[in-house]
């Protein structure tokens, strides 16, 4: 399964913020520059992460962003479920767009459903804290 850039950027933002002190405010430009990502793309991502409670945004001259929850409370599987548009691996997963004549008898859909469930089950076992265990190395690479 391939994650969208939107989800990739969401996870990268969370990783970046998790390597900072909990009260430290970061601006979007710093994140964009560290990852060589468009600031405009990140603004959309951060807005959504804020609505979901993963980040806290503070407006104004001395504003910025920081994690809205402790890293150990941010589940990777949950983040991915919130940021991915859909999990329609193949056409038959989408009832409205399914035109495959094999759908009524096909065993592939069942196999792919099991694979998707296993994929998400693994992601559910990890938190942001697990992902940033090597914070010192991450900080070096991001600076």
UniProtKB/Swiss-Prot annotation:
Q: Which cofactor does it need?
A: [2Fe-2S] cluster
Question: Under the cellular component aspect of Gene Ontology, which terms does the record hold?
Answer: cytosol
Q: Which residues bind DNA?
A: 28-51
Can you name one GO molecular function term for this protein? 2 iron, 2 sulfur cluster binding
Q: Which domain of life is it from?
A: Bacteria
Q: Which UniProt keywords apply?
A: 2Fe-2S, DNA-binding, Iron, Iron-sulfur, Metal-binding, Transcription, Transcription regulation
PROSITE patterns xrefs: HTH_RRF2_1, HTH_RRF2_2
Record: residues binding [2Fe-2S] cluster? 92, 100, 106
Tell me how the cofactor is bound. Binds 1 [2Fe-2S] cluster per subunit.
Residues in HTH rrf2-type domain copies: 2-133
Pfam families noted in UniProt: Rrf2
InterPro entries, from UniProt? TR_Rrf2-type_CS (IPR030489), Tscrpt_reg_Rrf2 (IPR000944), WH-like_DNA-bd_sf (IPR036388), WH_DNA-bd_sf (IPR036390)
Database matches in NCBIfam families: rrf2_super
State the protein's purpose.
Answer: Nitric oxide-responsive transcriptional regulator.
Q: What is this protein called?
A: HTH-type transcriptional regulator NsrR
**Organism of origin:** Bacillus licheniformis (strain ATCC 14580 / DSM 13 / JCM 2505 / CCUG 7422 / NBRC 12200 / NCIMB 9375 / NCTC 10341 / NRRL NRS-1264 / Gibson 46)
Gene label: nsrR
